[in-house]
Amino acid sequence: MCRLPVASLIICFWLVERSYCNNSLQDSMRELHTRFAISLYQTLTETENNSNLIVSPVSVSLSLALLQLGARGNTLAQLEGTLGYNVNDAHVQDFLSHSQANMKNNSQGMWLQQTCTLFIQSGVQLLPGFTQLASEWANTSVVRANFSQPNQTHSQPERAGHQQDESWHLLAGSVSGELSGSGEAQAEALWWGHRPQVALVNTVAFKGVWQKQFMFTNTQNLPFVLSDGNVIKVAMMYQAAEVSFGQFRTASEQRYTVLQLPYLGRSLSLQVVLPSERKTPLSSLEAQLTARQLASWDGGLRRTKMDIFLPRFKMQNKFNLRSVLPALGVSDAFNPAAADFTGISEEGLYVSDAFHEVRIEVTEDGTKAAAATAMVLLKRSRAPVFKADRPFLFLLRHIKTGSILFMGRVMNPADQAS
């Protein structure tokens, strides 16, 4: 019989335990991220009424995690309670770093831009420890801002041990990259109060190519029934394909279907969620979404040959999360009398604004294209049909980590207003 040395046995047990701990942490973080995503989305639906909506939960959570690095006392407790984890934990930091690295992989056919910028009042003395941590945080930067003159900021991000004093004009799109025009709007929104301020700006944009592209020649102008019962004509994409599909029920026994369309490389997928009954309002499904339901999709989707009808849509939303996050438990950070960011500076900072800007475009191939003009007659098929011809939810998820990059709804595909 082969006998392993004691040292080898110890190493084996250590590797098994480490693997178990990593898997346990990954499962826990996945559920916490999903819970936060749903809570954030459901809170936004209460204020956005029946309009198109999109939000990037992973981008917002990244911003709150950055604030955690400098928060103390009850401010830290609220941020930790909302996210469900403390980023000061080394294991959590490692997990988040790996997750960001996985999502940052811009391969052929996929482009993802995510930034988080912390604007801090010019002249405030920052603690070197915080600037060092912030510089190591994925896709983030700390920038000087003159809140008394909204069109003046400081161009260079903070580096550990250095202060920047040069001012510059915040050009349109300077914060948001390709989200043109947003920079000036963000600058104008900054205002000077009685205490030094922090403004948090995060932006995210995605463009991807389908694993199996829709043919432009199959796109037709077809009816789409709005929530008020009115019918409009929209550009409806079509393809026959084998996809992941499942039927589910909410806690109140309302039936709904989930269709999953992978992007090129299969690291990301778009999940389209549609009430099975036409009379079921989308708001009813939105209110009953839970992390457990989303987890059940992973095991409940089956490969199915289907005829797929999906409207082409494009949307962009801008939010000041200052009016949203208190409902999720983050209030002290925005309160000049209660905020505790002594891990950033000893000069009494608070968050004046938290801007979130996000956009998405879904077309036949994932890129901008002119509308197809040809009308096509499609042959009859015995395959099941998934037809998103009424309001629906969508989630763009990272397959490996389960992170929800985007979550939103399409109430009117023809409405492209931001």
Language-model regions, residue ranges each:
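Secretory/exported precursors with cleavable N-terminal leaders
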Residues: 2-418
